[in-house]
Amino acid sequence: MTWKPKMLILSHDLISPEKYIMGEDDIVELLGKSSQVVTSSQTQTPSCDPPLILRGSGSGDGEGNGPLPQPPPPLYHQQSLFIQEDEMASWLHQPNRQDYLYSQLLYSGVASTHPQSLASLEPPPPPRAQYILAADRPTGHILAERRAENFMNISRQRGNIFLGGVEAVPSNSTLLSSATESIPATHGTESRATVTGGVSRTFAVPGLGPRGKAVAIETAGTQSWGLCKAETEPVQRQPATETDITDERKRKTREETNVENQGTEEARDSTSSKRSRAAIMHKLSERRRRQKINEMMKALQELLPRCTKTDRSSMLDDVIEYVKSLQSQIQMFSMGHVMIPPMMYAGNIQQQYMPHMAMGMNRPPAFIPFPRQAHMAEGVGPVDLFRENEETEQETMSLLLREDKRTKQKMFS
């Protein structure tokens, strides 16, 4: 491949930045030849176009009076898309000069908002010219640009887009790619590539194994997504990490704990039900016992004369006093007195029991027969009198014991 310097012959009064546009890396040599200024570019550029010769009115040739050739329009869609193989190779091996491509595809006000921690981005150089000649536009890049736009439109129409762990951005992003760029995808990692040439771009590829499902392309702080494989291919499941295993163990432990708690609650419910049943049985037995005690107290109240008290302690006091009075009567009978003096009874006993006894209920004999004296009895000596008193005392004691037994049986039955 041969490189030829581009010769531009200009008049001394036509050298201006509007007529001739020089790149940043161009080296121009000004030569004076027959009252004309000749500029020679020392940069290596492919010899795709013939040199542009502009003649002024001050030249000595006869063609100076002719009209100046107009520069071709800057629109690239009028350029022929058919090129030869050698020209294609020359464009592919040309240094990366793509400022014109990015200047027309991107808005001038778009600023990079994406964090630049993973890849270093070079600042974009200032624009070189206000318009670009059609001869300097490589046709290969135009084809790559159109392919990229078609790819972007197809990826936007897809509904099933896998984000791959990269944060989503607004959908109005611009996809920039070239025919020679390739995006590698590795298993479990995320690779990024930086391409410079007017606008910095970052390509983010989520790692999904050799058969990745989606590719994320970030451009000047924006992202666009595209499918790199058929949607029918199954997504490979990543192996479980230590965090997932720990979460699974914790979940199983919680389930086991919940089951144990349910069993404990059921046992508590059964225990509480048993306790409630035992309490109910105890209440029933206590009620029955109280009923029996009330019945015995009623029977004892019937035995005591003129007993109008319902309190248990007072009723028991009356019973004790009544038994004592009976014992005193038995002692007097045994002594053989003619009649029991009223002074021997207590005041309350005499008031309570004596009138009641005189009405006929449990009525004792009106008087105790006075034993006759020995000299008055006919054929009866003092020994016989003592025996008679002893027998009377025994009968009285037996009666009292029987009555006491009956009272106790009624109280505890």
UniProtKB/Swiss-Prot annotation:
GO molecular function, one term: protein dimerization activity
Residues covered by region (Disordered): 40-75, 232-278, 391-413
GO CC annotation: nucleus
InterPro entries: bHLH_ALC-like_plant, bHLH_dom, HLH_DNA-bd_sf, PIF1-like_bHLH
Pfam families, sorted: HLH
Keywords: DNA-binding, Nucleus, Phosphoprotein, Transcription, Transcription regulation
Tissue: Expressed constitutively in leaves, stems, and flowers.
Biased composition (Basic and acidic residues): 246-257
PROSITE patterns in alphabetical order: BHLH (PS50888)
Superkingdom: Eukaryota
Subunit structure: Homodimer.
Record's protein name: Transcription factor bHLH23
Native source species: Arabidopsis thaliana (Mouse-ear cress)
